C-alpha cells in the first residue's frame, strides 16, 4: 500500500525554525564580522589600556546607580499608587508605561529645557536671586535621564506584584494590627522581593546598553560608555579594529546580563483571592500624606520635561520649521521605516511563537523555550553593536549601500522582537489552551487556523505589539547614528543635528513633532481593532 512521504521538517515547525535561523544567522554574521576586524596583535596590550578600563568601569557604575535610583524609589511609589485612588490615576499609569517607548532625544530635549543652565529651574532660581549650579551633563545628567525613563517602568512592574497579593492576606494583617513596617515586612515584601531582582537586572541591562542618552548628556571622556566609544571609534577616529574589539566586549557583557535577567525572571503566580483590591479602612493621616508627596514628586519628575517639549515647541520658528522640506523628508523616512520594521517584527515574532506553541503542545518544552530564547538573543547585541557588525561586514564585502533603509528597517525589527514576544507570548498560550482541542476536532490547521482563529482572537495583542515595535523604531537613534547622512535622515537624527548646531528653537519644534507623532502613531495602531471588536 502506497503511503505519502513524510516531510523532513513538519510544516508547523518551518515558520519558527526559519525565523530563529534568520535571527541567529544575523547575530552570528555580525559577531564574525566583529571578530575578523578585531585587532590581531597582543591582547595583553589592549587589556592594559587604562582608558578602556575607565570606559568599562563607568559603563557598569552608571548602570548600577541608575538601577539603584530607579528601583528603590519605585518600591515606595508602587505602594502609594496601590493604596490611593485619585482622578488621573489611570492616565498616570499609562504614562508610566509610555516612558519606555518615548524617543530618547525627545526626553533629553525636555530634560535640558527644564534642568539646563538656561532652563526653567535656572530661570526660576534667577528670579528668586538664587544661583542654579546643577548641570544636566556628565554622570548626574545621565542618571537623571535614566531615572526619568526607568522609575515609572519599575513602579508599574512592582505595582503588578502588589496587586497579586491576595486580599485575604491584607485583611488578616489588618485584623492582627499589622501596620507600617511590620505590614511591609511580612505581607508586601515577600511578593516584592521576587519581582525586584528581575526588574533591577532589566533596568541595569537597558542602562548599560544606553547610547543616545550618554551621547547627548555625556560630559566628555570622563562620562563615556562602551557603546559611545564604539560610535567614536567609527565616526570620528575611523578605527574599525578598535570598534570591533569594543563591540565584542559590549556583546559579552550584554550576553551575561541577558542570561542573568532570564535567570532572575520567574513568573509570579497571582494569588487566589475573593477580595480583589481590598483596602484597609484604618487609613492613617501620615500614610495619606506620605503617599501624596510621593505621587506629586513622581509627577514633578515626569510632567515638566514633556510639558517643556510642548511649550518650547510652540515658538516663533514654528512656521519656518514646518516650511522646511528637510523636516517632512525626515518625517516620511521615520514613518516608512517604523511601519516596515513594525510589520516585520510582528511577523517574525508570530513565526517564533507559532512553532513554539506547537512544540509545547507536543510536550517538547525545552525545544519550545530554545526557540523563544532565540528571539531574546538579540538583547545580547544592542543596536549599535549590531549596526557596527553590519557596517564592517558590508564595508569589507560589497560596500556600504547608497540607501540605508533596508539595514535600518531590518535592525530595528530585530531589536523590537523581545518586546513583541513579551506582549504576544501569554495571549498566544491562552488561545492555545482555549481553541486547540476544537481546532483538532475540526481539522483546522496551518494557514486556515491562523486566519480563522489567531488573527481574530489576537487582534488587540497584535495591534499592541505592532504599536510598540513601530514607536520603538521611530524613536531609535543608535542604528541611524552610524548610517545617517544628509541624504538619509530620520526625525531623531535630524533633531540631533539641530541640537549639535545649537539651533535650539528649530530643535524644539522637531522634538514636539516627534513626540506628537509617537503618541499619535501608538494610539492609532492600538485602536485599529476597534473598541467593540469580537475576539471569540
Enumerate the language-model features and the residues they cover.
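Short helix-to-coil transition segments within interhelical loops
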Residues: 163-192, 359, 437-458
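Short cytosolic juxtamembrane segments of multi-pass membrane proteins
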Residues: 270-281, 361-362, 528-536
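Glycine-rich helix-loop "coupling/hinge" segments at transmembrane-helix boundaries
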Residues: 113, 212-238, 476-504
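Short amphipathic alpha-helical coupling elements at transmembrane boundaries
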Residues: 45, 90-93, 126, 167-175, ...
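Flexible interhelical linker loops that connect adjacent transmembrane helices
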Residues: 4, 263-294
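Membrane-water interface segments at the C-terminal ends of transmembrane alpha-helices
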Residues: 7-41, 50-163, 191-216, 245-262, ...
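Juxtamembrane inter-helical linkers in multi-pass membrane proteins
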Residues: 171, 179-182, 268-282, 317-318, ...
Amino acid at each position: 500500500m502506497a503511503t505519502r512521504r513524510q516531510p523532513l521538517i513538519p510544516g508547523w515547525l518551518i515558520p519558527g525554525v526559519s525565523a530563529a535561523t534568520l535571527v541567529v544567522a544575523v547575530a552570528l554574521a555580525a559577531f564574525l564580522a566583529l571578530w575578523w576586524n578585531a585587532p590581531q596583535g597582543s591582547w595583553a596590550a589592549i587589556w592594559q589600556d587604562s582608558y578602556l578600563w575607565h570606559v568599562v568601569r563607568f559603563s557598569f557604575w552608571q548602570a548600577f546607580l541608575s538601577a539603584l535610583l530607579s528601583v528603590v524609589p519605585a518600591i515606595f511609589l508602587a505602594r502609594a499608587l496601590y493604596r490611593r485612588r485619585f482622578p488621573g490615576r489611570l492616565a498616570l499609569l499609562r504614562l508610566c508605561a509610555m516612558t519606555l517607548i518615548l524617543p530618547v532625544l525627545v526626553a533629553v530635549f525636555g530634560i535640558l529645557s527644564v534642568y539646563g543652565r538656561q532652563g526653567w529651574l535656572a530661570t526660576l532660581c534667577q528670579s528668586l536671586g538664587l544661583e542654579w549650579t546643577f548641570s544636566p551633563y556628565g554622570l548626574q545628567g545621565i542618571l537623571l535621564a535614566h531615572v526619568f525613563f526607568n522609575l515609572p517602568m519599575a513602579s508599574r512592574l512592582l505595582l503588578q506584584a502588589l496587586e497579586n497579593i491576595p486580599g485575604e492576606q491584607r485583611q488578616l494583617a489588618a485584623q492582627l494590627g499589622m501596620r507600617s513596617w511590620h505590614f511591609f515586612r511580612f505581607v508586601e515584601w515577600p511578593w516584592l522581593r521576587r519581582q525586584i531582582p528581575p526588574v533591577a537586572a532589566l533596568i541595569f541591562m537597558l542602562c548599560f546598553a544606553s547610547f543616545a542618552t550618554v551621547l547627548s548628556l555625556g560630559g566628555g571622556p570622563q562620562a563615556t560608555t562602551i557603546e559611545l566609544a564604539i560610535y567614536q571609534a567609527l565616526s570620528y577616529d575611523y578605527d574599525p579594529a578598535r570598534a570591533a574589539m569594543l563591540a565584542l566586549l559590549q556583546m559579552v557583557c550584554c550576553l551575561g546580563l541577558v542570561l542573568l535577567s532570564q535567570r532572575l525572571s520567574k513568573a509570579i503566580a497571582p494569588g487566589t483571592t475573593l477580595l480583589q483590591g481590598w483596602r484597609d479602612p484604618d487609613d492613617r493621616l501620615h500614610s495619606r500624606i506620605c503617599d501624596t508627596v510621593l505621587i506629586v514628586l513622581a509627577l514633578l519628575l515626569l510632567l515638566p520635561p514633556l510639558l517643556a517639549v510642548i511649550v518650547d515647541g510652540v515658538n516663533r520658528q514654528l512656521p519656518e520649521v514646518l516650511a522646511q522640506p528637510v523636516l517632512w523628508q525626515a518625517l516620511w523616512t521615520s514613518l516608512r521605516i517604523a511601519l516596515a520594521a513594525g510589520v516585520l517584527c510582528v511577523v517574525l515574532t508570530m513565526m517564533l511563537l507559532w512553532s513554539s506553541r506547537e512544540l509545547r503542545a507536543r510536550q517538547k518544552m525545552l525545544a519550545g523555550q530554545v526557540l523563544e530564547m532565540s528571539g531574546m538573543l538579540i538583547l545580547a547585541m544592542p543596536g549599535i553593536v549590531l549596526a557596527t557588525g553590519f557596517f564592517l561586514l558590508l564595508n569589507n564585502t560589497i560596500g556600504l549601500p547608497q540607501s540605508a533603509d533596508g539595514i535600518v528597517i531590518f535592525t530595528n525589527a530585530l531589536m523590537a522582537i523581545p518586546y513583541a514576544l513579551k506582549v504576544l507570548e501569554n495571549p498566544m498560550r491562552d488561545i492555545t489552551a482555549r481553541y486547540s482541542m476544537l481546532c483538532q476536532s475540526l481539522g483546522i490547521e496551518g494557514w486556515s487556523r491562523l486566519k480563522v482563529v489567531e488573527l481574530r482572537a489576537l487582534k488587540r495583542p497584535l495591534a499592541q505589539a505592532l504599536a510598540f515595535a513601530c514607536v520603538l523604531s521611530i524613536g531609535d537613534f543608535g542604528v541611524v547614528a552610524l548610517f545617517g547622512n544628509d541624504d538619509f535622515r530620520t526625525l531623531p537624527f535630524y533633531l540631533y543635528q539641530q541640537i549639535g548646531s545649537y539651533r535650539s528653537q528649530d530643535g524644539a519644534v522637531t522634538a514636539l513633532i516627534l513626540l506628537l507623532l509617537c503618541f499619535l502613531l501608538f494610539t492609532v495602531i492600538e485602536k485599529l481593532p476597534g473598541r467593540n471588536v469580537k475576539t471569540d
